[in-house]
A protein has these predicted regions:
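Catalytic-core "active-site belt" of small-molecule-metabolizing enzymes
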Residues: 1-130, 144-145
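A conserved acidic, glycine/proline-rich C-terminal tail/linker
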Residues: 131-152
Length: 152
């Protein structure tokens, strides 16, 4: 992809699905899936106060999730710029079950299995560091355009 920083996209309401939903493959273009972690925050995050600890205190709950992409690239590799231009997320998210914030330094694995085949995995990820490591970047990046990372 040739990206040297985190990517961001917009998740529209109609693209947010709950666990157990049945989606039609015909509604997507060459669908691909990734295992991810998502968080819901309990307050708006003031970019001037943003720090790792401030963000950690702002987490209400954690979700394993499936990120759905339309795996279509029209240009030549590397495709990072095209990925960003097409909104990164592309096609939606399926939220798994809600998890409360665990104790610090908890190690976890996340695996996405589809049709009995391992599609994606995260191994030995440490809470909160591996899951929240890029949120500070996102908060400050959104602040450049006067967008506040909010809890709504």
């Amino acid at each position: 992809m040739d990206l040297f920083h985190p990517a961001k996209g917009t998740l529209w309401k109609h693209e947010l699905h709950q666990s157990g939903v049945e989606l039609n493959k015909k509604d997507y273009f060459n669908p691909a899936m990734e295992a991810e972690f998502g968080v819901i925050i309990n307050r708006d995050i003031n970019p001037e106060l943003a720090s790792f600890d401030y963000i950690l205190e702002s987490v209400q709950s954690i979700y394993p999730l499936i990120e759905i992409h339309n795996l279509v690239f029209n240009g030549d590799a590397p495709n990072g710029a095209e990925l960003l231009a097409n909104n990164s997320i592309h096609s939606g998210v399926i939220l798994g079950p809600e998890n409360k914030v665990p104790n610090s330094n908890e190690i976890t694995d996340l695996k996405l299995v589809y049709n009995n085949e391992l599609v994606d995995k995260w191994i030995d990820k440490k809470w909160p560091f591996d899951m929240l490591g890029e949120i500070d970047w996102l908060v400050k990046d959104k602040a450049k355009t006067n967008n506040i990372f909010n809890s709504k």
